[in-house]
Amino acid sequence: MKNEQYMLKLVLTDHWFDEIKSGRKIHEYREVKPFWVSRIYSCSKAYAEERIKRLNKEYDLVTTGNEYVEFQKAYRKNAEKMIFKIKKMSIRNGKYTDLHIDKWVFDIELGEKIR
C-alpha cells in the first residue's frame, strides 16, 4: 500500500479479527494509555503522558496522521491481515464498549475495507 506511513497497525485475537472481518464489529477500542497514545500519535511515551492529560479534558474527536488501520490475526507466521480506512477516531468512556472498563478509550470507527 502506498500510504504505509499513515497506517496504524494492530494485532487482534482470532475472535475479534473474525468479528471485524464478518462486519459485525465496526469499532475497535484501545485504552488511553501512554503506549497507545504514542502509537496513535507517533510520539514518545514521555510526550504521550502529557498528551493524555489534554486528551481527557479537551478532546472528543481525535485528529492524527493515520488514515488507515491494518489488523493482523494474532502473532503467527504469515498471519492474515486486513486494511480499513479510518472513518473517525474519538475518545469516549469504555464502560459500554467491548472493553467494559470505566476509563477513557480510543474509539476507532472503521470505514471502507481496502483489502
Question: Whereabouts are the PLM-identified features?
Answer:
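Structured alpha/beta reader/binder surfaces that contact nucleic acids or chromatin modification marks
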Residues: K2-M7, V11-R115
